[in-house]
């Protein structure tokens, strides 16, 4: 499973290192939030040498890229693990996270921080494309590492069956997937540096049962230390020889000649040597900036008409739900502007990758998930109400909208149904949409110049883009020409224009996230040297300085600081002649990929789960039962069968057959309306009410179920049953007719609402309730029954 920096960010924003809040999946007759199939995908299969890639036509070019990189990754991992996977690997891709949230591979709607998953049952790899080629490659290889891990574990267990096997901790399995895929980025380094310098870096024994997103960078750094110090070959040896050991500690002691505690001490010392040097060159944010608020991200400074007070809009999950807050620079007068994650029109703000725009009239614009795709939302900050909403049929995700100075248009980054990320311009009030860029590159974080003629944005349209680099570019709105503003093998992002014409942005060019500013020629300087990291800047004015996000004390916070004098030294300069050539998706030119012929997806049911039990009570009888679950590869179709029986002692085989119960149920999840049909036979002794009413019943019948989600938080359910019932109540004093033989028709209609917020310990906020109306009719006797 791949979570990476998103989950780490969210977990730390919530102050919870052990997990990310979520919700239970929706089930018939129970609570849980809904996963909605807004569209039916026309799935096709693209075969490779080792991988079968499942895709839909809108993303075919992306599918070929994914297949090429999957086969390349297979070859790399085959050599690193000295192992070949003995089955074809199903790889399912989605063109956006919005589409991914409709997948039936998972029983729940995947949260935004989940970027990929490898399941244990069918060994499927499922992941979305989020617009960035390098991130997609990273996640794909991360998940393929898990495929090899599962294959090696299965091989060891089958060849050398034992009652107990050494269990690998999560930090090892996820850390190895990170180490073998790409390694730590600047945000991972930021968290590792803070843990090390603050003395909070956990030991390896403390990590044995740890979970949550934070284990990804920690585990990756541990495996990097072990690989660079002792050699990667020992990692592969552990998987081949794990069957020999009773515990993970025993395996480490044999392979590395060190105990777990000794390896922990070595790694901790390695980390201190790596990060303590940064203390001398940097200063904590507490010494260089003023804190606005903790547990917050993506600040936007603004002033309402007629008000001289500078306030900041930002995202925060301070109450458990991610909402939009407003606060003044002094850190007082805080209130929630828009409540998020509780209603259909504000389902998600994508707050870890999108920001808010505010114009001089006090109208805030932001992207929000609304039903099947994102919408541009316009919120009047003074009137405190929604004043506009725009959605576009070909755009599924909207990020970082920004106003043009004249207030007549909004520029934003949009992800198309094909998976391509481009810049768009919405003209107001007519709602006309103009596409500003159109290519395979990821174009994000736009900001319009004070004169309204130019857009600065971050993009991977640089020769280093395939490796994850982003540079800043200037787009001339009159001509459509694009030119470099910064250039280099690093990540420059979140640019914003200041009133003076300077551009403030975030960069990791010196190894950590810091704030820089440049003029329109690309010449400028570093503005911060924060120990934890500084990012997402916005220059306000010479009095208020600039606001920005920072990381300190294992928390994402907001700060403001005084800007340096314009006479400071120049430390940033644009290459006098950056290359005009960009880069192309190299996998598309590989013959095996280009010549692969897709075929329509065909349903083939496979056994997912089987379980059985038997019990014998001497002198009383025996009982036995089994359950089987079948599904197709995409889990759109499920088939569940059960069978059980009981026999009284000495009653013989005939009694066993007479007391058989069984059921068969089919569930179709291909459309928004999920439906199921089934048949059953039940026989046995049952209790009801307070367990004082004992009855014996033999029944058989059919049933049908429907589930229609109105939104993520509300749904309708309906059920119809027609059964023949032969029932005898032993508590004859309670009922007037001890025996009832009849055909019964039952109808139920249920409304469910659930926007509750969950932690591993249970719900902590929100509400959930259900209301059911039902009617059971005794067809034979023309009366209602129960």
Short names for language-model regions:
Residues 53, 77, 171-187, 194-261:
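Active-site-proximal alpha-helical
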Residues 305, 452, 507, 550, ...:
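Outer-membrane beta-barrel strand-turn architecture
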Residues 556-557, 562-676, 740-765:
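Outer-membrane beta-barrel initiation region
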Residues 30-37, 42-45, 208-213, 237-355, ...:
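Beta/coil-rich, acidic/histidine-enriched accessory regions frequently appended to metallopeptidases
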Residues 674-786:
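Transmembrane beta-strand segments of outer-membrane beta-barrel domains in Gram-negative
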Residues 292-294, 315-325, 340-353, 365-377, ...:
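A flexible loop/linker signature enriched in serine peptidases of the S9 family
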Residues 308-310, 361-362, 406-408, 451-453, ...:
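Short coil/turn segments that connect the beta-strands within blades of beta-propeller domains
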């Amino acid at each position: 499973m791949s979570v990476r920096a998103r989950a780490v960010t969210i977990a730390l924003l919530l102050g919870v290192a052990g997990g990310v809040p979520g919700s239970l999946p929706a089930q018939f007759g129970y609570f849980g939030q809904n996963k909605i199939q807004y569209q039916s995908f026309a799935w096709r299969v693209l075969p490779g040498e080792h991988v079968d890639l499942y895709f839909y036509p809108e993303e075919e070019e992306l599918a070929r890229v994914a297949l090429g990189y999957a086969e390349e990754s297979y070859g790399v991992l085959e050599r690193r693990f000295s192992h070949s996977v003995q089955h074809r690997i199903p790889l399912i891709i989605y063109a956006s996270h919005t589409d991914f949230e409709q997948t039936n591979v998972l029983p729940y709607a995947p949260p935004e921080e989940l970027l990929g998953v490898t399941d244990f049952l069918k060994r499927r790899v499922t992941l979305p494309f989020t617009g960035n080629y390098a991130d997609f490659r990273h996640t794909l290889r991360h998940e393929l590492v898990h495929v090899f891990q599962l294959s090696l574990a299965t091989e060891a267990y089958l060849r050398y069956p034992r009652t107990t096997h050494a269990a690998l901790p999560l930090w090892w399995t996820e850390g190895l997937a990170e180490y073998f895929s790409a390694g730590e980025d600047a945000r991972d380094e930021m968290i590792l540096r803070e843990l090390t310098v603050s003395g909070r870096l956990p030991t390896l024994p403390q990590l044995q049962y740890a979970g949550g997103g934070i284990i990804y960078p920690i585990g990756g750094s541990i495996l990097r230390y072990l690989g660079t110090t002792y050699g990667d070959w020992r990692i592969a040896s552990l998987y081949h020889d794990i069957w020999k050991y009773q515990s993970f500690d025993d395996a480490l002691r044999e392979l590395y000649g060190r105990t777990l505690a000794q390896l922990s001490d070595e790694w901790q010392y390695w980390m201190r040597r790596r990060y303590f040097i940064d203390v001398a060159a940097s200063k904590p944010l507490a010494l260089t900036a003023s804190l606005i608020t903790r547990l917050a991200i993506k600040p936007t400074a603004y002033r309402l008409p007629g008000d001289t007070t500078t306030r900041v809009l930002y995202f925060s999950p301070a109450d458990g739900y991610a909402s939009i807050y407003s606060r003044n620079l002094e850190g007082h007068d805080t209130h929630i502007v828009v409540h998020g994650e509780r209603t259909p029109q504000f389902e998600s703000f994508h707050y870890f990758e999108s920001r808010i725009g505010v114009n001089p009239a006090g109208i805030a614009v932001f992207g929000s998930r609304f039903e099947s795709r994102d919408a541009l939302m316009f919120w009047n900050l003074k009137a405190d109400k929604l004043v506009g909403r725009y959605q576009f049929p070909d755009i599924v995700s909207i990020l970082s909208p920004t106003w043009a100075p004249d207030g007549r248009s909004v520029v934003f980054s949009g992800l198309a149904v094909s998976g391509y990320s481009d810049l768009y311009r919405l003209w107001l009030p007519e709602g006309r949409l103009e596409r500003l860029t159109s290519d395979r590159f990821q174009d994000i974080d736009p900001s319009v110049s004070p004169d309204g003629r130019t857009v600065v944005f971050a993009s991977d349209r640089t020769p280093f883009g395939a490796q994850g680099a982003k540079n800043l570019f200037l787009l001339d709105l009159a001509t459509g020409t694009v030119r470099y503003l910064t250039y280099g093998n690093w990540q420059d992002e979140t640019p914003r224009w200041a009133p003076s014409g300077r551009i403030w942005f975030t960069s990791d060019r010196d190894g950590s996230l810091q704030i820089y500013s440049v003029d329109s020629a690309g010449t400028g300087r570093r503005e911060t040297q924060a120990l934890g990291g500084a990012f997402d800047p916005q220059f306000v004015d010479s009095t208020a300085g600039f606001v920005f996000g920072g990381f300190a004390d294992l928390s994402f916070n907001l700060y403001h600081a005084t800007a340096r004098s314009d006479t400071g030294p120049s430390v940033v300069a644009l290459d006098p002649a950056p290359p005009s050539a960009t880069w192309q998706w190299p996998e598309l030119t590989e013959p095996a990929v280009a010549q692969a012929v897709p075929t329509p997806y065909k349903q083939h049911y496979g056994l997912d789960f089987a379980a059985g039990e038997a019990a014998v009570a001497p002198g009383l009888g025996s009982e036995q039962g089994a359950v089987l679950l079948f599904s197709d590869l995409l889990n759109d179709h499920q088939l569940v069968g059960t069978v059980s029986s009981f026999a009284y002692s000495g009653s013989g085989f005939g009694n066993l057959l007479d007391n058989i119960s069984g059921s068969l149920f089919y569930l179709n999840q291909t459309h928004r309306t999920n439906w199921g049909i089934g048949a059953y036979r039940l026989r046995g002794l049952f209790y009801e009410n307070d367990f004082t009413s004992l009855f014996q019943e033999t029944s058989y019948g059919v049933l049908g179920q429907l589930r229609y989600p109105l939104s993520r938080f509300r749904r309708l359910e309906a059920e119809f049953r027609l059964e023949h019932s032969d029932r005898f109540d032993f508590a004859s004093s309670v009922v007037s007719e001890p025996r009832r033989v009849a055909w019964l028709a039952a109808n139920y209609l249920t409304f469910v609402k659930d926007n509750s917020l969950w932690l591993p310990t249970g719900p902590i906020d929100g509400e959930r309730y259900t209301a059911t109306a039902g009617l059971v009719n005794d067809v034979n006797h023309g009366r209602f029954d129960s």
